[in-house]
């Protein structure tokens, strides 16, 4: 075990010099809401509840999860991240819960611990691993450190239990809220196409799929969005769930602020339009924009270009042989990542609202679910799922060379390129890979044509990636949620949906099969057998080898058949418990300091006296390290409006889009907190102030924290 930790430390050191970054900026707009009611039938189809809770982790000094860029360390909050939970109960008392979280993914240990906490509250039979479905939106702008597996904790310097607990507790509290708010309800659904919002970032790999299969579809990405409208017995909507495939990478790897990215922004827009100002993350209306098969799907709709404006190489996504020079830009002006987030999130919101208002297909039928754990390192893949290969099996986990190349959403560094099938590789990186774990001849054959860079499944005594996968299907009437533990590419998702639909259609009329992406654990990417052959990023990150998709189709097919037959499925092997086998190398906050003659909360640079709309208010405070207290269900800032004699009303906080909370460590060792507010055009004229709240650790020999607050001088918005 010690040798494994030494190897991890050495790899961390190498990774810290591996990746590079770039720069980009902001704007904002408002989107009008035009809601209407759809008349419900007289009888309730279900009992449904919805809940929302804060899961925002450390906003300072912790690496952000997603791009694996060690230089992308958190330094504040743009807007908070939430868990949105929906409990469904049918007339027979069968229940299931779907949770969409503003997190990069759901890790195995998160799902297991959430179920443990729920069973502590409700007993062993209400919420189980079988009827709890947890899904991440895949934002790349949330704090990392919440996985116990080494590969996903390298750039975060290990497992940060405080982040892990924040996410788990937030999910549980969202479910508790949903559980307590269950009421007679009806659900309606509608599906439509959303364009100008996603593109395929690996068309070279997609094009390797069979011509007759590609001819079945109008695009190389899924354009369908499906929306679930949930309303009470008076026809008043209180929740919505949308499913649409697009990466949450509108915010690029130069961003250092916590953000829900485009899907989080879409949720924020809808909830705020319905619930009103000053209600970010508070409900009662809850809107989730769930993830789907986004593996090769980018929101950066301008596509990849070289920095000089010339096109990137189609096969390798390089410029003059270097992948660092090939970037995809979003639709914002000059590629502005904040504006791009608004546009892509706004597009999803607008389409979802349109479908929501026109939803006419009533959802009815029982709540059902099946769940199995499957050891995925040696699954025998049988026809028709074996791609015509005899004795097809999955492999122990491995990452290919193109994994290190990154994608056009966030390129890697050095001499790695996509579509690299060169098994001789680079002697230096071969040495590094062999140092971690040297691939065996059987492993090389099994993973072929992938040239193995990191043999993560062969590391002893504990693999660097999970190898026991949760396979889960949840049905709510004709809605079939296929909970996939990873990132399915466009064509992989289509094949899985089609295969499940064909089976489950024997017992469910006109089933609407939806991929719930990045659910219950994370196992990297799932490319088709054909896409795997060209080894772009998605194929190189298909952990269990070329037959990974076939094995998932086979195992999900077993669950679908079980639902048709009304039978149970085996629980499967118990996944590893890595508690006590993790390390975290980021030092704790020892003590906070403030300049001489100043105290925590004192203003360093005050606001101006007068502002107009579209201007940015800025105030700098001396503060404490935000890692002291994450301010869950609270805020590091408030924008307050004077509404009466000495009466202040908070109109914005750090859960809002128009504000930014920024942290910086001063050279002399104290924290500088900058609060920014971009004044929206519809802002009420009046007298305002900026407030900053936090906790300081004044004594290095005590764990006690001291709350503090700072207030700017008053200013006028005209």
UniProtKB/Swiss-Prot annotation:
Annotated catalysed reactions: an N-acylsphing-4-enine + H2O = sphing-4-enine + a fatty acid
Sites carrying sugar chains: 224, 252, 358, 378, 391, 421-422, 577, 610, 614
Active site (record annotation): 298
GO MF annotation terms: N-acylsphingosine amidohydrolase activity
Subcellular location, principal: secreted
UniProt keyword annotations, A-Z: Glycoprotein, Hydrolase, Lipid metabolism, Secreted, Signal, Sphingolipid metabolism
Keyword Signal: yes
Subcellular location: Secreted
Family designation: Belongs to the neutral ceramidase family.
Protein name: Neutral ceramidase B
Organism (species): Dictyostelium discoideum (Social amoeba)
């Amino acid at each position: 075990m010690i040798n494994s930790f030494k190897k991890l430390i050495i790899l961390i050191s190498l990774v810290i010099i591996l990746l590079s970054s770039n720069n980009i900026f902001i704007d904002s707009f408002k989107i009008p809401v035009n809601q209407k009611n759809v008349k419900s039938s007289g009888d309730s189809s279900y009992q449904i509840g919805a809940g929302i809770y804060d899961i925002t982790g450390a906003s300072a000094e912790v690496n952000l999860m997603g791009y694996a860029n060690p230089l992308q360390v958190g330094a504040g909050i743009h807007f908070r991240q939430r868990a949105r939970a929906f409990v469904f109960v049918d007339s027979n008392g069968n229940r299931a819960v779907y949770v969409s979280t503003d997190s990069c993914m759901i890790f195995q240990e998160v799902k297991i611990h959430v179920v443990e906490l729920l069973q502590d509250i409700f007993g062993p039979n209400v919420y189980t691993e079988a009827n709890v479905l947890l899904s991440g939106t895949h934002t790349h702008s949330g704090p990392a450190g919440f996985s116990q597996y080494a590969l996903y904790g390298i750039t975060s310097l290990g497992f940060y239990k405080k982040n892990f607990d924040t996410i788990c507790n937030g999910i549980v509290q969202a479910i508790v809220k949903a559980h307590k708010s269950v009421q007679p309800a009806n659900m309606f659904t509608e599906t439509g196409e959303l364009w100008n919002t996603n593109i395929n970032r690996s068309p070279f790999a997609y094009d390797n799929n069979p011509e007759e299969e590609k001819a079945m579809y109008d695009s190389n990405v899924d354009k369908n969005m499906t929306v679930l409208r949930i309303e009470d017995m008076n026809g008043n909507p209180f929740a919505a769930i949308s499913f649409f495939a697009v990466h949450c990478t509108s915010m690029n790897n130069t961003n250092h602020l916590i953000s829900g990215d485009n899907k989080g922004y879409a949720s924020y827009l809808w909830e705020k339009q319905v619930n009103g100002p000053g209600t970010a993350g508070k409900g009662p209306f809850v809107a989730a924009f769930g993830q789907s098969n986004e593996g090769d799907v980018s929101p950066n709709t301008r596509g990849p270009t070289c920095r000089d404006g010339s096109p990137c190489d189609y096969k390798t996504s390089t410029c003059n042989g270097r992948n660092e020079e090939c970037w995809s830009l979003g639709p914002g002006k000059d590629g502005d990542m904040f504006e791009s987030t608004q546009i892509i999130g706004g597009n999803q919101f607008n389409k979802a609202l349109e479908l929501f208002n026109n939803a006419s297909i009533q959802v009815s039928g029982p709540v059902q679910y099946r769940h199995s754990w499957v050891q995925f390192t040696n699954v025998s893949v049988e026809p028709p799922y074996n791609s015509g290969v005899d004795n097809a099996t999955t492999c122990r986990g491995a990452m290919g060379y193109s994994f290190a190349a990154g994608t056009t959403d966030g390129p890697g560094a050095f001499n790695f390129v996509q579509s690299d099938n060169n098994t001789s590789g680079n002697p230096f990186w071969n040495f590094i890979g062999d140092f971690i774990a040297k691939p065996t001849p059987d492993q090389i054959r099994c993973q072929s044509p992938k040239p193995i860079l990191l043999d993560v499944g062969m590391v002893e005594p504990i693999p660097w990636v999970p190898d026991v996968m949760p396979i889960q299907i949840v049905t709510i009437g004709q809605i079939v949620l296929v909970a996939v533990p990873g990132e399915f590419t466009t064509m992989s998702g289509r094949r899985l949906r089609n295969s499940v639909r064909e089976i489950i259609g024997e017992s469910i009329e006109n089933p609407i099969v939806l991929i719930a992406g990045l659910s219950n654990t994370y196992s990297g990417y799932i490319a088709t057998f054909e896409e795997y052959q060209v080894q772009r990023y998605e194929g190189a990150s298909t952990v269990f080898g070329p037959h990974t998709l076939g094995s998932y189709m086979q195992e999900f097919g077993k669950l679908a058949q079980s639902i048709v037959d009304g039978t149970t499925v085996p629980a499967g092997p118990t996944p590893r418990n890595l508690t006590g086998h993790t390390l975290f190398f980021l030092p704790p906050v020892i003590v906070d300091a403030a300049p001489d003659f100043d105290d925590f909360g004192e203003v360093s640079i005050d606001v101006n006296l007068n502002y107009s709309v579209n201007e940015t208010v800025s105030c700098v405070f001396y503060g404490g390290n935000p890692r002291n207290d994450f301010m869950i269900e609270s805020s590091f800032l408030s924008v307050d409006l004077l509404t009466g004699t000495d009466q202040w009303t908070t109109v914005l906080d750090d859960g809002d889009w128009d504000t930014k909370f920024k942290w910086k460590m001063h050279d002399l060792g104290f924290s500088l907190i900058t609060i920014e507010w971009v004044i929206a055009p519809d802002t009420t004229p009046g007298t305002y102030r900026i407030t900053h709240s936090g906790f300081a650790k004044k004594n290095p020999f005590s764990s006690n924290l001291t709350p503090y607050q700072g207030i700017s001088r008053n200013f006028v918005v005209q």
